[in-house]
């Protein structure tokens, strides 16, 4: 039996050694260019170009065909997506599941809405691999990963909200003021949507706030994954704080 793990690229995980795994591209777009989020993307160049871009930007989720291509010929597929409250990726994957199972009777696709992004998705992908390696059956894997998800939490910090302004999520004037005064936004996503919880000045206060919010959310030891965008120093400081 062939079993496969699939996710969209918001997991920031393009390969997974020891697992049959495929990442499906999300797309970041402006009026002049598209960036396909895969292992070939020059992230530094994209960040630089977006930092000086004045127009609107946005994202596009994988289409049904992209998901079907990723499912390939697997007998069982275990899939997770960015929060369905933030993107159409989850609904697209569900549509692909229905089509795949209808076209291939007997095959199964489990689609899990992470209700988060990035590190949370990585934790779920790792859990899928662990249970597949333990030769658990399909229903057990689905049930145990769903339960595992309930014990995860994502906390984020934004140094800049420029891109949120460019895609219309916040006012440009608000973004300019936040950047001018070095205000960092710290938040979580308890219901799958971005939920700002704190506004602080400077990186040091942001890191302290992240850890405080971890404890408030019930963290008392355990695995933590830290993603960052060209901020290794802050990631290491947070690691040492934890």
Residue ranges and their predicted role:
Residues 81, 110-111:
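A glycine-rich beta-strand to alpha-helix segment
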Residues 3, 10-27, 32-33, 86-89, ...:
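Mixed-charge interfacial surface used for oligomerization/domain docking
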Residues 33-102:
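Class I S-adenosyl-L-methionine
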Residues 105-108:
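A short helix->loop->beta-strand "cap" motif at the edges of active sites that frequently abuts
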Residues 4-6, 78:
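Conserved beta-strand elements of the Class I
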């Amino acid at each position: 039996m062939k079993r496969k793990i699939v996710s969209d690229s918001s997991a920031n995980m393009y390969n997974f050694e020891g697992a049959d795994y495929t990442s499906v591209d999300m797309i970041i777009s402006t009026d002049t260019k598209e960036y396909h989020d895969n292992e070939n993307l020059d992230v530094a160049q994209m960040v630089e170009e977006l930092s000086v871009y004045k127009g609107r930007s946005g994202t596009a989720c994988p289409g049904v065909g992209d998901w079907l291509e990723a499912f390939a010929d697997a007998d069982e597929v275990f899939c997770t997506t960015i929060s369905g409250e933030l993107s159409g990726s989850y609904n697209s994957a569900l549509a692909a599941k229905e089509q795949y199972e209808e076209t291939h009777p007997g095959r199964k696709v489990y689609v899990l809405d992470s209700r988060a992004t990035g590190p949370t998705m990585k934790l779920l992908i790792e859990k899928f691999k662990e249970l597949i390696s333990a030769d658990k059956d399909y229903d057990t894997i689905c049930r145990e990963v769903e339960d595992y998800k309930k014990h995860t939490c994502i906390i984020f910090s934004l140094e800049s909200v420029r891109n949120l302004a460019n895609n219309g999520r916040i006012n440009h004037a608000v973004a300019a003021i936040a950047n001018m005064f070095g205000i960092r936004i710290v938040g979580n996503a308890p219901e799958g949507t971005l939920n700002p919880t704190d506004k602080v000045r400077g990186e040091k206060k942001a890191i302290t706030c992240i850890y405080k919010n971890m404890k408030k959310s019930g963290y008392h030891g355990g695995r933590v994954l830290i993603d960052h965008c060209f901020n290794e120093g802050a990631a290491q400081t947070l690691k040492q704080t934890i």
